[in-house]
UniProtKB/Swiss-Prot annotation:
Active site: 118 (proton donor)
CDD domains to which the protein is assigned, alphabetical: UdpNAET (cd01555)
Name of protein: UDP-N-acetylglucosamine 1-carboxyvinyltransferase
Organism: Roseobacter denitrificans (strain ATCC 33942 / OCh 114)
Pathway(s) the chain acts in: Cell wall biogenesis; peptidoglycan biosynthesis
Keyword check for Transferase: yes
Residues bearing the modification 2-(S-cysteinyl)pyruvic acid O-phosphothioketal: 118
Amino acid sequence: MDSILVKGGGSLKGQIPIAGAKNACLALMPATLLSEEPLTLTNAPRLSDIRTMTQLLQSLGAEVTSLQDGKVLAMSCHGAINTRAEYDIVRKMRASNLVLGPLLAREGHAQVSLPGGCAIGARPMDIHTDGLSQMGAEIELKDGYLLAKAKGGRLKGAVIDFPFASVGATENIVMAASLAKGTTVINNAAREPEIVDLVECLRAMGAQIEGEGTSTISVQGVDRLGGTTHRVVTDRIELGTYMLAPAICGGQVELLGGRINLLAAFCDKLDAAGVTVTETENGLSVARANGDIRAVDVTTEPFPGFPTDLQAQMMALLCTAKGTSVLEEKIFENRFMHAPELIRMGADIEVHGGTATVKGVDRLKGAPVMATDLRASVSLILAGLAAEGETKVSRVYHLDRGYEHVVRKLSAVGAQIERIAE
């Protein structure tokens, strides 16, 4: 099992290209199930989760071809398809549940195993299945599979009130509603850029959707969708992660493809902490002078608030801030699993339920640490960049699910980092 070795102490300078959004691509790929015409995605990230979704779609009968070293995905799904998403594939990744809505909309029935992915909280499927049930689906759980069937063979439009703004459920229902009979209105819909990206793709395929980016989305179902070519939006979580690298180490780095409007709340917190973020012709420039990082309080919220997927990385920055910071995790429970590992590096952190109190220390010290999930793994790498001595991060297979070429990208701006096989 591979590890990553980081030697801290140096500042960073240069450019890092930001990939297409993993979370957008994982929703866009199942959209091919909604049409018999080709769907091509450009700017696709090269990640293990994308390969898992490729395997899943191929198992359902879709043709998926990876071009240009994985940056282009050419997909088509014509003729009869398989409607059973098997456990052996679905268990690898939670986003596998995004085939449920498209399969049900296209074929009128589906069998989808309950999913896997990072072990962060309960993340139940109820909000997905409740929404589909309101659209006329009969759904039962049997032997670990969700068995779904549309009454009369086709889903029907409905007014759906989500109890909370779920990204995955919004994506599933929007795709299902695109081919449903009548109009579907989703209240308390998620507003993330990845949902806007999905809707723009579906609209190019012929879907009639309004309200993306707001809390109310309206979908007028159509009889069929066509094909299109669509560019995947920039990955705002990869963007935020690499913005924190010069913030932690010092120096100046330009993030190619970045935009402030993807991460406005996050950029506000960086500014409050003493980090300079400016827009450039090609992206964002992030710089930290020799001054100290200031403590800031952070509360994770649905978009446009501070992203839960950047909480662990932000904690790494605040470990050496002047003063005391409080981080409140309001999206997922059990998402401070990185804190004990940061404490091994000398951080002063106390966790009580969904709140972590971080008292800044002068400097972290390198140590052997273990990644517990995707975002925790990269937070430990960031901490290692600024630590005194050498940090060895084990179980870095998590990284491959969400970051392409992390060692190459950080090395290119001056980080001392290498991946070692064990």
